[in-house]
Each structure stands twice: as C-alpha cells, then as structure tokens.
Amino acid sequence: MKAQADSRFDYVKINLASPERIRQWGERSLPNGVVVGEVTKPETINYRTLKPEMDGLFCERIFGPSKDWECWCGKYKRVRHRGIVCERCGVEVTESRVRRHRMGFIKLAAPVTHVWYLKGIPSYLSILLDMALRDVEQIVYFNSYVVLDPGNASNLSYKQLLTEDQWIEIEEQIYAEDSELYGIEVGIGAEAIQRLLQEINLEEVAEKLREEILESKGQKRAKLIKRLRVIDNFVATNSRPDWMVLSVIPVIPPDLRPMVQLDGGRFATSDLNDLYRRVINRNNRLSRLQEILAPEIIVRNEKRMLQEAVDALIDNGRRGRTVVGANNRALKSLSDIIEGKQGRFRQNLLGKRVDYSGRSVIVVGPKLKIYQCGLPREMAIELFQPFVIHRLIRLGLVNNIKAAKKLIMREDPSVWTVLEEVITGHPVLLNRAPTLHRLGIQAFEPILVEGRAIQLHPLVCPAFNADFDGDQMAVHVPLSLEAQSEARLLMLACHNILSPATGKPIVAPSQDMVLGCYYLTAENPKAQKGANRYFGSIPDAIKAYEQGTVDLHAYVWLRYNGDVVTHKPDTEVLKTETLDDGSVIKHYRERRVREKDGEVISQFIRTTPGRIIYNKTIEDALVAL
C-alpha cells in the first residue's frame, strides 16, 4: 500500500467493489504466515487494562500496534524489533500510524443489499431488476417472497411476488400426494435479490433493450433508455450487478473512528464504533442461530435485523427508523461523514487550508482602479513575509532570517517601505466562494490600506456575485514567475469585462454607483441655495459647491462653448436682449447665447453642480483611456 501511495497517478476512479476486493483491503498475511483481518468480536477495549481486545474493533493484530514499536503484550519494545511478529500475542512490531490506513472486514452470515443502490435516487437495484422499488423493498425486508423459478406451475411467473399465505398455499400443493408441480423455487431477502442479479446476462439484456428502444416511444422508451444506460455502465466498468449485494463489509481503520479517554475516566467514541458493534452482534447471533438449526422464522427475523444494522452503518436514517445514541442524537454513519459541506470531501479534501493565503471581509474601495484591490497591511506583511525577508537581507538591513523576523514584529518603518516595493507589480488572486464560474477568481494589483478589511472595486462585484453586507473573500499569492505572469495576462480584472458564458458585459454599474449617478443628476427644487448664479468655468462651479455657496442641485448658469444635446430640441427663442455693443442675447429654455453679426460670442447653459461633477468625471475617465 505504501508503494501505491508513493507512486504517481493520473486520476482516482470510484467503482463498485467485489467481495474479493473488499477482503483484499482488510486481509493480510503477517511475516509468520498467519492471515489476519476478520473482525469477529464487538468489543473495543478492555476497560480494566485499557488495551484493545483481540479480534475486536481495535484489535492490534489486525490493525497494528497502538504504541510505536511495541506489541500488545509488551514482550517486544523498541525499534530494533522492527517487523517481528510476537509469538505470544501475534502483533507485528511496527509504527502505530499504520492504524490510520490498515483496514479489516466483517464476513456476513447472510448477504445484505447496499442501501445506496436500493434507496438511492434512482434506485439502481430496481432499474436493473426491472421491478418497482416498493416490490424490491418488500423482498429485501422479508415481507414478500419472489419467484426465482416458476417450474411447471402455470399460475406463477418469474419475479412474481408472493405473500406468506400465498406461498404456504403453494407449498401445500407441492407436497400433496397427487401433486404434479415440480421445479418451483422462491426466495426472500437479499439472497433472493443476489440470485436474481446473478442471473442477469448484461450483454444479452443490453442487446435486447436496444431492439426494444427502436420499436417503442414515449414514457416506455425513456424507461428503457434509463435501464440501458445503467447496464452499459456496468459493462464498461467490468462490474457485476450482484456486487450491489454485500457478503463482506469493510471495517475502516481504527484511528479514523477513535476512542478517546476523558478526564473523568469515561470514554468518548466515534459513532461508527456503535454502528459496527450492532452489525457484529447481529451477525454473530445469526451465525449461532444457523449453527443450532433454529426455526426459519427466527433466522429470517435476525437476517432482517442484520440488513437494518448494515443500512444504519452505511447511511443512517435513509430507510426506516434512525438509530440514535445518548440524548436521542442520531448516530453519524459513513454517508454522513462523507457527504455535505462538513463532509470529508468538501471540508477536508477540497477545502484544505493552503499557505500564502488569507481571508477577510470585503468593503467598497471607490478610489481604486478596476484592476486594484486594497490589502490590509497586517495581512500583506504575513502573505509576503518570505519576499520581504529576502529583500531585507539583500539590502543589507539585516544579516539573517531571525533578525528580519524581529524587525517585522517590531513594525520597523523600513519594513513598510520594503513591503511597498515587494507588492509593486506582484498580483494577488481574490476568490469568493462559491466559485461557480471562472470569474469567481480574479487577479488584482494590491494596494496597502489601513484597517483589517479587503477593499474591492465595486464594478467587479457582479462577476464575484459579491456585495458589501459582510461577504468574505480569500486572498492567494501566486509564487512562481509563471503563475504571476499568467495572473497578470489572463486573470487581471480589467481583462475580464465580458462574461465567458454569454459574451455580454459582466462589468456594469450597480447599487451605490447607480444611486450616486442618480443623486448627482437628480432635480431637487427645495435645495436651491445659490441658484441662478453665473460661472465662467467648470472649476469655478465645483469650487463654489465645495465651499458651500451653492447647493448640489441648485440650477446655475455655466459658460460652455461646446455643443449641447438635450432630450428635447431646444431651438425656441423665449426672449431676445440687444446690448449697447450691438450684440444680442438669445434666451432659450436651457441656454443663453450671445451673438454678434451671426457669430456666437459666448454660451451659458442651465445645469447643476451635480451634473457638472458627473460630466467632468466621465470626461476625465475617457481622456485617461
């Protein structure tokens, strides 16, 4: 197994495991030739000696020693006895960490169905058997018999369900003196399901289904295609349908379901141990009942209980009553450990913490460029620490790493100067979960800011589906030159204007920006302080607003010699004034124009300081491009 773990591989494939494969996982030969792996006892540890019980759920012979280089009985201690198998207890002297990957197995006295394939959506067992899920459940949980071979009976058919009373009636007919019935076989429970699955010839059924699909349509055709798809997948993966019925159950390594002693001498244990214990107890009881040739009804009841125990172990609560522990809390099964946000995949494998990353709340940074983000100093010094230390040593400010770290801890002014130099031109990646499309991660040039929040340009929010009501974002530092150049060329926010899904612009003003634009250009008849004043230039008007002599929404006259476009044509002269120098002032609705001999000398337009600021901001932005 170690050799397999060390070797490189391209992908991981999840497949159905055969009973032989499950045995191989848990079964192994000790150096002295003894084969171990089967867990036969429900005990965990001896509460007097606090040592694992042999052949139990924490058995050292099966899973390896609890202490490094020490056998169960204590005869062999120290690393010099590496690989020796103790003659007294049969434990191999090795490291205790093998208990994290060595598995065991439970050999079941009767086969049981896998609850995922029975109660999953869709139910693969019912699809393969071409039976209703309700009927398959009736068979599995010992409520109905199924005809495995109708023999010469004219009133029976293959896979027909029979109640207890119906089967008793048929039995009486079979064993009657004048009976001509023979070859009739019925079954119940997972054994019957296993037999039905074993009789399926996948290639023949697939060929037959393809012919039927060509001739059928509608709902029937969809059902046939669904069944064919499942069968084709079984053929492609070289899996047998009867592997969905378990005869051997794997026992996961003990260090993945630990038992911990608490201060008061009590023990805290993983729920899995309780679920495994239920399976082993019922399995052992069933074995004893079979040995003593107990009545069929008792054996059948025990088989049903074993099926329910295995169901609870694999997926507690999927079918029937949920198994609960102390305080009526549902026990966590294998499925509960794997699935969901807190499961093994999303929490521990996909959601691993990585170096050179940080996380903080985002706030709006209105003065940032679209390709910039505000990075808190506290976070930046931690993320870029190796780069800062390297530069401090290269500049001769310190002689070694330890001195550089002390300088950083003291927050010496030279550190901030060096940090500024380091982050210049070094992009960082910002990610907001959930990352549903590629624009969920983008690159930005960091700008050092005070505080503890990451500042984000409001225009990139739609791409991240972010808002500023408490959202958090993660920061990652690309380390290699290739990663940095890729981030700069492909992932910089200013290169991601269009949505990759639709091709439409994803960068669009929203929320505060739209509100701000509306507020600047809106009318407010009540705020008319300084109205009807004349200004010779845009800077004069803005200065007057900043000094508080004019309200933002007050109508003023601004000298402007460019073209004026209004939503309604402004060509109607309301009034004309003739001045002493012969020039004429024409009063329009939105402007006043002074002309002489047909030439325009000056033009004043009616506007507000808010609209002047809005127009100037857009003009400056366009000039900057």
From Swiss-Prot:
Protein's recorded name: DNA-directed RNA polymerase subunit gamma
Cofactor requirement: Mg(2+); Zn(2+)
Entries under PANTHER family matching the protein: DNA-DIRECTED RNA POLYMERASE, DNA-DIRECTED RNA POLYMERASE SUBUNIT BETA
Residues binding Zn(2+): 71, 73, 86, 89
Functional summary from the UniProt entry: DNA-dependent RNA polymerase catalyzes the transcription of DNA into RNA using the four ribonucleoside triphosphates as substrates.
Keywords from the UniProt entry: DNA-directed RNA polymerase, Magnesium, Metal-binding, Nucleotidyltransferase, Transcription, Transferase, Zinc
Cofactor: binding comment: Binds 1 Mg(2+) ion per subunit. Binds 1 Zn(2+) ion per subunit.
Binding positions (Mg(2+)): 467, 469, 471
GO BP annotation list: DNA-templated transcription
GO molecular function (one): DNA-directed RNA polymerase activity
UniProt record similarity statement: Belongs to the RNA polymerase beta' chain family. RpoC1 subfamily.
GO cellular component: DNA-directed RNA polymerase complex
SMART domains the UniProt entry points to: RPOLA_N
This enzyme's EC code(s): 2.7.7.6
HAMAP family for this protein: RNApol_bact_RpoC1
NCBIfam families on file: PRK02625.1 (NF002729), rpoC1_cyan (TIGR02387)
Enzyme class: transferase
